[in-house]
């Protein structure tokens, strides 16, 4: 870290520390040791970067440990900079992390799960490959307004996946990405309206439940 800070100081002095067309984030590490993470966050906060990420908590650690590390580190993150949780996660993970002060996320989960038929809905997660959807003419999620839910049935999408048709994966990925984008939109609206706590309590477990 000392070498990194020294190099950052040198680059800033030379006026070429950051590409002006991109953002530079400091990434907080420290495994599951809160004292190391807090000390590391304090030091990288001094670099005055565009944002700060919490890394190394989505590679097998228990979710409760992840939440605890976020709670420990967040008070030491600059209040006016983006807070980014790397590699997370399920809708429930996102809601819990937002409740702890996180702004930004990235994860392969919505697209990877979609390719295997695991689809997010506002009632929970469905496995569209299950036999019970073979003749189900309803959309993936009646509460969803994505192009997939407006135009295709569960039965048809299941048929595509079972037949290994590429269109099936395209449609399921489109749906899950739409769901995640709408989830983040809902979270922003609930925060603006001051109703996020009620939203959290209603959906944090429901959205990760398999139905």
Regions found by a protein language model. Give the residues of each.
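Carboxylate/His-rich catalytic cores and anion/metal-binding grooves
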Residues: 1, 5
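C-terminal extensions of enzymes
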Residues: 141-211
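Glycine-rich phosphate/ribose-binding loops and adjacent secondary-structure elements
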Residues: 7, 11, 15, 19-140
């Amino acid at each position: 870290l000392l070498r990194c800070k020294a190099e950052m100081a040198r680059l800033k002095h030379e006026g070429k520390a950051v590409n002006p067309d991109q953002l530079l984030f400091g990434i907080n590490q420290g495994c599951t040791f809160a004292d190391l993470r807090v000390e590391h966050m304090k030091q990288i906060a001094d670099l005055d970067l565009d944002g700060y990420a919490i890394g190394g908590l989505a590679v097998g650690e228990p979710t409760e440990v992840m939440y605890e590390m976020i709670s420990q580190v967040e008070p030491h993150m600059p209040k006016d900079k983006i807070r980014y949780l790397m590699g997370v996660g399920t809708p429930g993970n996102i809601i819990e992390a937002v409740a702890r002060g996180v702004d930004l996320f990235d994860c392969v989960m919505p697209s990877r799960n979609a390719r295997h038929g695991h689809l997010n809905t506002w009632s929970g997660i469905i496995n569209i490959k299950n036999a019970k959807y073979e003749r189900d003419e309803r959309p993936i999620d009646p509460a969803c307004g994505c192009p997939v839910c407006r135009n295709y049935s569960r039965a048809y999408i299941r048929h595509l996946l079972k037949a290994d048709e590429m269109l099936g994966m395209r449609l399921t990925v489109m749906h899950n990405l739409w769901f995640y984008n709408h989830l983040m939109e809902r979270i922003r609206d609930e925060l603006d309206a001051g109703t996020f706590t009620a939203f959290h309590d209603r959906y944090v477990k429901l959205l990760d439940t398999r139905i």
